[in-house]
């Protein structure tokens, strides 16, 4: 199902098939793109393991902190490959609090290899800092790489779930308080059905708990 199909399905569901429309194609497109991102996070739908720009970070000797790609929100596997090494070494994702309790002096400790990593909202910190240049190797769940713009564009999530994206667009459309189409009952129903299908959005406490589940062999979530 492409963007053109989704907009048409939205208009049928919203009783908005007669010009002049209550909502422009531009607004509906914006809501549908929001829906793809929401679905990806709630359902953990887009697992990335191969794209170098997301899954590989060049690391330098002595430098501990590196930015993550902005679409990556949950890491499922993390390792460090020193240049010239035969195989990468898997890292554990932990919190700074865990390191304070279990590895006193970790901020200044020097070891012969990287052991842990601390993930923040947009970066990864290697502990200790790499003793040699290398590569940070990542796998994890991500947001869509691009938004739909033209009518032929297709959502990145599986085609089986495309029609459910309309539910989020309906929720947004009927939630506009200054619109003649404002309908809180239909908005609530649409949001409830979307949540029933894709799951709830993780709140900040859950994201932190998941990111710092100690130590748990690289499983984290950020937004």
Question: Can you say where each PLM-predicted feature lies in the sequence?
Answer:
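Glycine-enriched, solvent-exposed interface loops adjoining structured elements
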Residues: 1-223
